[in-house]
Amino acid sequence: MTRRSPPSTFHAPGMARSTTMRYTKMSRTATSVRWRTMAPSSPTCSHKSRLEWISLRIVDQPTPRDRMVQVVRWYLSSYHAGRKSQVAKKPYNPILGELFRCYWEMEDASQHGDKTEVGEGPVPWCSPDQLSFVAEQVSHHPPISAFYAEHVNKRIQFDAWLWTKSKFLGLSIGVHNIGKGTVTLLDVGEEYTLTFPNGYGRSILTVPWIELGGSVSIECIQSGHKANIEFLTKPFYGGKKHRVTCEIFAGSDKKAYYTAQGEWNTRVDGRWTESGRSEVLFEVSNMKPRRKRVLPVSRQASNESRRVWRHVTCALRAADCDGATAAKRAVEQTQRDEAKLRLASGERWNTQVT
């Protein structure tokens, strides 16, 4: 079987070519994901949490059915509720060209594994046994973020782009997540294309809470397998929060060979239709978060998230909201000034990751 390399150019539909995220000499990998509310953090940085609960076991599954179920397990488990924080919070609006890089040590990596730096890719200083990740804000109007991750030795990769549109809905705020992601298994030549649910901030004037809602799909063109997932919003009267259901089909089959249901922030149970065997697809309480590895701020480039927002972060940790506001405005004013200079000179914006 011919081994497939990832595309050298990543392009989100609707983006000008000047806002294209490009990757060169990549022939590697990536996997897991998890939505989390993070503070203090820029959204460009926080999307990396989708990769925090890694399921590299996708590549170890023997059949297309097993691999699709494993992709669904990873996808659904990645949305569970995130870190609690007692510090003051201030929203960070990612600036154009902002980058975030990190990597994770994997549990299944050999203690004496290959520690040679890969020398290229999202995080050139990590090893082939580690999962690396990079995110870039590739457009400001509209706000589009692009992401890429890979695990060299497992030969699995993940790339995605996301554009959010917000709308007030009375006492709620709705966030429409426009975009898609692709999990690529290089050795078996399979690509799993997925979409994202919408988010809702409820009871914004009293005790706010967040839920997901809408239909999403995960599809593998090569194997013909497809998962239809429904994130169910809570009814106005009664009902449970955070419900999710899933059906997985093979080819043109009318009957799902695997179904799942539960609460995405606690536990989801699955069932194999043919055998009737039931299983716990995932349980959040058994999931151990992994600590991401990031360069010290002093060694980061000027456009990397933690360096861009360092003064805002310091103010938030000191519970100084006025200081955080001033620092945030300074960052945003610099962005506006740079945009005016580009407009005056006719310069087109080029993405940073090449």
Regions found by a protein language model. Give the residues of each.
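Extended acidic, Ser/Thr- and Pro-enriched interaction/regulatory segments
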Residues: 1-56, 60, 65-354
